[in-house]
Amino acid sequence: MNWKNIKHGTELKVKMNKIYYSWKQVEGACLDIARQINNSDWRPDYIVGITRGGLVPAVLLSQYLDVPMKSLDVSLRDGGDTVSNCGMAEDAYGFNPSADGEPVCKNILVVDDINDQGSTIAWIKQDWQSLCLPNDERWNFVWSYNVRFATLTNNLASKEFVDYSVWEVHRQNGW
């Protein structure tokens, strides 16, 4: 395919067993996720976009929700490169207490394009928890309240749960 000949707004079809969405579809999906978040009792303090596929949706959600955005390099499928981020783990856990000694937990929305088999979400949970008091039971609260996950597409057969998504698939063997 000659990418130079593709005009803006062209909807791309399935290629090599992948589904490509148009820019308009991605914008609409991100607006839908922003509405889901606005209709919930939860609001992120910041958004984390997972490289590569989560960066565009994270930027759009950051703009729609007026919330800062950071990125996290987790490329399990594309060569296994991952970068830990102790600061994000500490923010979620509330490792740095306030002046009165109470934990100050930040709400973090982690955004990716797809929750396929759950490997990225599982890696983030394991990594962040291992960086900051890994055996503390408070992590159960952190994962159920402070950190939430959003993807454009959610595989219902995934081992991990996604809080916000737009499209659903059910594939036992992943993409």
Spans of features found by a protein language model:
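Active-site-facing substrate-recognition patch
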Residues: 1-43
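PRPP-dependent phosphoribosyltransferase catalytic core
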Residues: 4-13, 126-175
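Short, highly selective alpha-helical patches that border small-molecule cofactor pockets
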Residues: 30, 54-58, 62, 121
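Short, well-ordered alpha-helices that flank and scaffold nucleotide-derived cofactor binding pockets
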Residues: 35, 59, 63, 126-130
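Short glycine-rich phosphate-binding loop at a beta-alpha junction
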Residues: 42-51
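A structural signal for isolated positions on well-ordered beta-strands in alpha/beta enzyme cores
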Residues: 46, 70, 109, 148-151
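Short, glycine/charge-rich flexible loops or terminal/linker lids adjacent to PRPP-binding catalytic cores
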Residues: 66-109, 116-127, 138-141
